[in-house]
Amino acid sequence: LDDAASDGVKEQWYAFRNDRHGDKDLHQLPSSWKSSIYLLDPANKEWQAYIAERNDEVYSSFDFDGYQIDQLGSRGDLYDYSGSKLNLPRGYASFIDAMKQRHPQKRLVMNAVGSYGASQIAGSGKVDFCYNELWGDEADFSHLHSVIKANDNYSSHSLRTVFAAYM
């Protein structure tokens, strides 16, 4: 959110479109919404601790059985605050591991949008199933079949696949 700093989110946690931390990556939303969605570095340990604390608050107030982590698919080249290139799929695995360590009894899943990061997500060994959100260029049965086979391979034949379906 535009005002995330007021809640304790640090500038150093964001994902940036250049190596000079001058342009935060974001998903632009209409001006009628509270804010656009800003992306953070999923491998940043301070961000992981911060969001895990927010999950603590949610779990203490609501009887949720788990957490669905979301992403936006491939974002092109992104950088951390110090100018190092991010490896988002590797960051996803780190984030998943941190969330599972914090709440080992809770279920966990992460959306592999367009199968981006699916290998690292399924290969983390910490999600309950493979979850894929496919788009228009992946609308054929052959695409679904390919994703199921790939996910089966990524998870060493241990996880089933669920697809997001929008009507």
Where are these regions (language model features)?
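Active-site-adjacent "subsite" loops/lids of carbohydrate-active enzymes
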Residues: 1-62
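Glycan-recognition surfaces
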Residues: 8, 13-29, 102-167
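Active-site neighborhood of glycoside hydrolase catalytic domains
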Residues: 43-129, 135-145
